[in-house]
Structures are given as C-alpha cells and as structure tokens.
Amino acid sequence: LYLNPIFEAASNHRYDTADYETVDPLLGDEQDFRTLCTEAEKRGIRVMLDGVFNHTGAKSRYFNADGFYPAPGAAQGPISPYYLWYSFHPFPTDYDAWWGIKNLPAVNERNESYVNYIITGENSIVRRWLRAGASAWRLDVADELPDEFIFAIRAVMQQDFPDAYLLGEVWEDGTTKVAYSKRRRYLLGGGLHGLMNYPFRTALLPYLAGTSGAEDFRDAMETIRENYPSPAFYGAMNFLSTHDTPRLLTLLGCEQPPADRDARAHYRLSPAERERGTALLKLAALVLYAFPGSPTVYYGDEAGMEGFEDPFNRRTYPWGHEDTALLDWFRTLGRLRAERESLQSGDIAYPLAAGRVLCFARRAGDEVSLCAVNAGAESASVDLPWAAPLAHDALSGQSFLAEGGRLHITLAPYDALLLTE
C-alpha cells in the first residue's frame, strides 16, 4: 500500500513537508499510522511511505518562511540549526528551490546534519518510521538525489530492516538516466531495489490509443528488460495512472482534450467516450496484471474515476458510485495473478506483436499463461504456438482446440484472452 506523503504540510498534496516527525492531523496521528501498519500486516499488506527528501516546504519548521514555528528556521538566518541545509544567493530572498518553485526550497543532501537527521542518526526519519511499522520507502524525485544519499538510505535499511524495500521515482530508463551531468548508479547494487516503471505506461498508452503499434510496446519493454537487473525488471512498479498523470480512463476515452484548464477541470466523458475508454482500460488492466513487475492500481482507477492532470486526477473516491463491472474485472485479474505463478514470476516471450494485436506469454516451470490483446476497432485473427491440445481462456471460460501445435483464434474488437493449459 503506497501512501503519498503523510507528514504535516501546508498543502493537501504534502510534497511541501513541514515536519517529518508529525503525521498531518488531517489524516490522524502516529498511533493511527501504527495501527494501520499492524492491521495491514495481519492481512498480508505492507505499507510504503513517500520520502520527499530533495526539498521541504517553505512553511516548515526547517525553513519557516512565515515564522509560524516558534523556533528559528533557515529563513531566520544562521541562528537556525537548519540554516546550512539550504543554499542562499544571497540570504534571505534568493535560494535554491526545486525547479525554481519558491515554496519548495531545495535542501543540500550532502550536508552532514541533514544526512544525520534523515538517514544515519539513531532516530533518523528513515529509521523512525520503519520502526513505526512502515515496510518500504519510495524516494520522490530519486534522480535528483545524490547517489551517495540513496546508498546511505539503503545501507541503513539493510542493516536494521533487511526486509524493507527502497523504491525510486524515475520517469525514464533508470539505467541510462543522466541527471545533473552524471550517469546515475542507483540500480547497480547497493542503491534502489527498484523503480516506478513509467516507461511501461509511456509505451502502453499510445499502443492502446492507436498512435503506435504493439511492436513498439514490445520493443520499449524489451529494452527495459535488457537494461535492468533481473530483480529490478521483475519487481518494477507497473501502473496505469499516478497522482502525477491524468487518469488513463480519461486519456483513452476523451476524443478531443480541452485546451482550457477550466474546461479540463469540469470535463466528464460522454457515454460513448466512456464506453470506449472503459473497454480500453480493461485491456490496459489485463496487460498490467499479466506483465512482469508488480501491478499497482492508483486508487479509483478500478472504480472508473476520471480526471485530467493534477489536481483533477486526485478527487475523492466515489463511494457508492463505483463502476461495479470494472471493479469485478480488476478483482478477477487480481485473483488470477495470485493463483498463477507464471503471471507472478514467469519469463516473458512475444509470439506476436504487430499493429493492434499484442500477444505475450509467461512461463514458470511447466505453467504457461498467454495474454492476447486486440486494441483495434476491427476483429483480428491470430495464429499462435500452443503445445497442449486445448487452451482455456481464464477470462471467459471458453476453450480452444489446438491443431498441429498452433491455435487459430479470432479476437473481437477491444477484446482479449488469457490462455492457460
């Protein structure tokens, strides 16, 4: 269960941390968090926290731009113990900030005091919240953190919490990433365990939208597979939407996105757009659950939530108004993923990837699962290798007879199969 930032902050998104030691009272308190982690673990669920360590909020106990906190912050000058966490040019009006956004002053991650506070101290932020029950950290803007900072977090986690997981937010291929003129090393061992797999979404969306072919998706994913260490590829955080992207249902359904921001704020798909978008979203979800990696669902996607960019993609969950058919689809995919070892850890091969048709097979030992997707508006006939005499579609319950080690199947428009032996 990946939570966006939970710590006290001035905004509702909380990427402008005000106090790393305090849960935002809008959400509850530390005891509530501990209870959540305890009850989640009883149900086989672990909690991952969002670590925003590249910058703080200007309205924070550390910077204290508005003087809200009684103790001096960096904005009050060298009297503050946090003054050297930030870089002023000159004090007090000009300072380094994340992408120049002044309410997000950037910290110096090489400052010894800051590293001790966040990572290495006996009661550091990393240690404190893992002791409180968290099982993982997701590092916000990981490619803007020094490699040494990431390695230090991993070392502390490995020492005190060897089962804890360290995930990084990187939007590109993490093995070829260059940031601030330096090739990043966080996937070479001793750094991040894995990454958010934005390349998966970046390749899947145009295939489903019809602006690229299945072969383009295959090629993009094979590049990632070739470049990534195997644990990072097979454990990548795959997703369809995040808090930083428009919801996939809206992107796939909307025929002509409004240019005006206010229009996007109030936009709702027409019945025809929603029907098409839902059909494509179901295909996307199937690929998500059948593909190597860890399928991750942004809250509400499974219920049919719509929304363009932030903040329109962050509305409240539609309690009592969910798309129940879509919910059932996601539940079915989750059950199949849990039941089939091939979908969890199997190797991948592509017997067919051309145009609107994407077929990939997962194999673990003697178990095979083959995902066949037609993202086109017309029927498609496919000819696939199949060793067993019969193929069973785990989605519809249909069975197909193989002839001479081949399956000859027609896929309806916007249709898919998950074939098992």
Where are these regions (language model features)?
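The substrate-binding groove and active-site-proximal loops of carbohydrate-active enzymes
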Residues: 16-30, 102-117, 134-144, 205-212, ...
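Aromatic/acidic polysaccharide-binding cleft in carbohydrate-active enzymes
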Residues: 180-181, 237-269, 285-323
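Active-site-proximal helices and loops of the catalytic beta/alpha 8
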Residues: 37-45, 55, 60, 64, ...
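Beta-strand-rich binding/interaction modules
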Residues: 379-397
